[in-house]
């Protein structure tokens, strides 16, 4: 068995932090029937082919085409992913976890891949600056949208296409790779009519669950990250998640602990705090997954219910010890903490002995001779201890190292846990009704035909009296 991601629940138990804020054996017995039910439901849905996302680790059909397309990408100086939300966060997490943070600054002969950029927002300053740094004529664009109609991504594409048409003319289509629905939507039509290379997103896999499809696997391959390693890591986690017992199934345990702390202990906020810069974007990916899947006020049938959901927050160790930790230790005890520990780093950097004056006199003489990894580990342990000492529940997710294989495990672990949590809350983890109205209003504001009533609502909103403005 290759290096496994494990979860340590010691710091969430009542015996560690007290019965008021920790889980007791009685609490665990209280939720155990629900966990058994959820595990059985997931297994049954998988047998009936209704949870396509959990079968993705065994889907390998696209890998040869992905590898071929990745080789062709190396004819470009730059690779830009146009996408937002689930269409971008997974790829960004892969880039950040598996490559040097300064990949784009490395000499061209040492990179082994194009310079990599992710264009998510429609801030005009950002896109304009990106096109100046990465001119379209030197760039391959991966346009990613499950629906094929995402307004932000399509708007970016229209800007980029205009620049490409001006700079490379009839070869503009060669600068695009599309990832979208296999049969429908504007992007699928565009790919078919212009002969643009494309990949399909499985119809049963929603955008925020799509990182183990070509949405994440193609950008990974372009970056020189082996998609097979991501899938193999996910497959190993899949095997571990087939057990119906929460003490053996890490994703079921993760879902159960989060649910129990929210419903039984009033912890409506969950903080993910990795102690590795390379996992910063993974934490952002998790935040979208958890928030958009679980924050609901309807049941799976679409009927109204009391609102539920746990607010995810990203922190980064050791940086946020110097910004957020004060609140976490002395502020309201309404949070569950997930500290992500990495036990082997790719680089070894020793703190050397020094002749700088005052080091020993100022009480810093104990620092030389240690590694930066030792310091980061010491800071992580200190944070755990301070939180536990203030009766804050802390679970620890342990990674042997940050690699494509361990990242594949993490993606699958949290996707499975999110689906299970949705079932515990009795909500549909795959829809997002709360964001649909905003999409309609956005299109109306931009002049979509047939949206005149919505457009009038927007005009009324913008023209409302501002008597409470502070000038």
Regions found by a protein language model. Give the residues of each.
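Extended, charge-enriched "interface" segments that sit outside catalytic cores
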Residues: 1-73, 354-367, 454-471
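Glycine-rich phosphate/diphosphate-binding loops that line cofactor/substrate pockets in enzymes
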Residues: 45-46, 65-77, 130-139, 257-268, ...
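Glycine-rich phosphate-binding loops that contact phosphosugars or nucleotide phosphates
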Residues: 71-244, 440, 444
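Helicase-primase coupling helices
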Residues: 307, 313-403
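Short beta-alpha connecting loops at secondary-structure transitions
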Residues: 114, 197-204, 309, 364-368, ...
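Short, solvent-exposed amphipathic alpha-helical segments in soluble enzyme
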Residues: 96-99, 132-135, 158-160, 192-194, ...
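Active-site phosphate/pyrophosphate-binding segments
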Residues: 167-338, 343-346, 434-471
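C-terminal helical cap and adjacent loop that interface with cofactors, partners, or active-site loops
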Residues: 380-446
